[in-house]
């Protein structure tokens, strides 16, 4: 069986010297338009797994099970139904991933119009894609839209463990840096959790402000704020001139731990 780790290794750069610096990208709202997967996908996925088990759930209990969080409310609802919460959560996420892929294949979401900038960045440094979205969904997006510039692709694992490793936990960013042999660089995202995860991984967080998050009060200080992926090219070129890929001059982009 092919695991997520196997998949990321296949996409990692093969051979050659290790890359000192990289630029990593979030997916939803950065590469793919919109905040993320429609909540209706999770609702229909829940219907799938409840129907399989012959369960009918309504009201507050159903709302707890529809949540994308593996929290006390979800576990309490499962306990009341007499089902294993971890198993139900993973099954629901498998169905959510399947349904989200079907919607993407049907054309419900498109690439952001400035993604061509990623190819230009990739000519300068290795680039990777690291998302809180499900790993099967992230891989589908890369293959479906032929995003061949990425040397590393990682979404989160399905199930409770993958949920716990979501950003702002830096787990998957650390995995990307290790796979690419990188010490530092940039992580481009569209929310505060992206900036926090970047800092925890020893990267500079670049906040991308688009229409969907135009009014967002970030609440944290990013290394840089941009309004288009095309602005990254200048950041990378400026950073490369002094041996680091970073928007600031404080040295925080170096990953030395």
Question: What are these regions, as identified by a protein language model?
Answer:
Residues 123-126, 203:
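A short helix->loop->beta-strand "cap" motif at the edges of active sites that frequently abuts
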Residues 104-107, 127-128, 162-166:
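Short, surface-exposed loop/turn motifs that are enriched in glycine and acidic residues
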Residues 22-24, 128, 186, 224:
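Hydrophobic "anchor" residues on beta-strands that sit immediately upstream
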Residues 3-116, 123:
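N-terminal helical cap/lid subdomain that shapes the substrate entry/recognition surface
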Residues 1-16, 135, 139-257:
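Asp-based, Mg2+/Mn2+-dependent phosphohydrolase catalytic module
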Residues 131:
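Conserved phosphate-coupling serine/threonine residues in phosphotransfer and NTP-handling enzymes
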Residues 121-122, 199:
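Anion (oxyanion) recognition and catalysis
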């Amino acid at each position: 069986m092919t695991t997520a780790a196997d998949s990321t290794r296949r996409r990692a750069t093969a051979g050659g010297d290790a890359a000192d610096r990289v630029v990593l990208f979030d997916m939803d709202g950065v590469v793919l338009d919109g905040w993320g997967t429609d909540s209706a996908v999770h609702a229909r996925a829940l219907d799938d797994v409840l129907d399989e088990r012959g369960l009918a759930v309504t009201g507050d209990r159903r709302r707890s099970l529809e949540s994308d969080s593996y929290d006390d409310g979800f576990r309490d609802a499962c306990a009341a139904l007499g089902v294993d919460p971890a198993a139900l959560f993973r099954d629901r996420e498998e169905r959510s991933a399947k349904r989200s892929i079907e919607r993407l294949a049907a054309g419900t979401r498109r690439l952001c119009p400035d993604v061509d900038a990623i190819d230009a960045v990739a000519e300068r440094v290795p680039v990777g894609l690291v998302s809180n979205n499900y790993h099967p969904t992230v891989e589908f997006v890369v293959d479906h839209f032929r995003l061949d510039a990425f040397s590393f692709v990682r979404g989160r694992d399905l199930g409770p463990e993958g949920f716990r490793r979501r950003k702002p936990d830096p787990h998957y960013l650390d995995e990307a840096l290790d796979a690419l042999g990188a010490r530092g660089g940039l992580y481009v995202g569209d929310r505060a959790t992206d900036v926090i995860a970047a800092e925890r991984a020893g990267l500079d967080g670049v906040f991308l402000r688009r229409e969907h998050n135009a009014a967002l009060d970030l609440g944290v200080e990013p290394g840089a704020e941009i309004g288009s992926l095309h602005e990254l090219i200048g950041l990378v070129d400026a950073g490369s001139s002094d041996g680091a890929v970073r928007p600031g001059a404080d040295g925080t982009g170096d990953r030395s731990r």
